UniProtKB/Swiss-Prot annotation:
InterPro entries in the record: Antitoxin_CbeA (IPR009320), CbeA_sf (IPR038025)
Something else known: Encoded by the CP4-6 prophage. An insertion element (ISX') seems to have deleted the end of yagB, fusing it to 13 insX' codons to make a 116 fusion pseudogene that may be expressed. The cognate toxin appears to have been deleted at the same time.
Keyword list, A-Z: Toxin-antitoxin system
Name of the featured protein: Orphan antitoxin YagB
Species name: Escherichia coli (strain K12)
Lipoprotein recorded as keyword: no
Length: 116
């Protein structure tokens, strides 16, 4: 799958392939808007299937992190999640209503490890 976007909606990362999105926060719920998401680089068919499977789990876990206040809309704080060989990073960037994400096909971030 090759979808290079001119607009980067998620967290900006220098690694490709990368899927980025700006999720809309409503209380402790997150909403995905397809027009606020995009790809940088190309994911293989296998990687695309991994992303399709992992994405709902990433979002559900981020919602739990909002509920526990580990992810706070008022303060920038990057969290890292791992699933299906993918690394997901998320941060509100203190935006009061958005959660920015980047999902990469790699391991090795040493921040807040959460295998979900």
């Amino acid at each position: 799958m090759n979808k290079d976007s001119t607009q980067t909606w998620g967290l900006k990362r220098d690694i490709t392939p990368c899927f980025g999105a700006r999720l809309v926060q409503e209380g402790h719920r997150l909403h995905f808007l397809a027009d606020r998401a995009g790809f940088t680089g190309s994911f293989s068919e296998v990687q695309t299937l991994q992303l399709d499977e992992a994405f709902p789990h990433f979002v559900a876990h981020l919602e739990l992190m909002l509920l526990s206040c580990e992810l706070n809309p008022r303060y920038a704080h990057c969290v890292t999640l791992y699933r299906n060989g993918l690394t997901g990073e998320a941060d509100t960037l203190g935006s009061h209503g958005y959660v920015y994400i980047a999902i990469l096909n790699r391991h090795g971030f040493n921040r807040h490890l959460r295998v979900i």
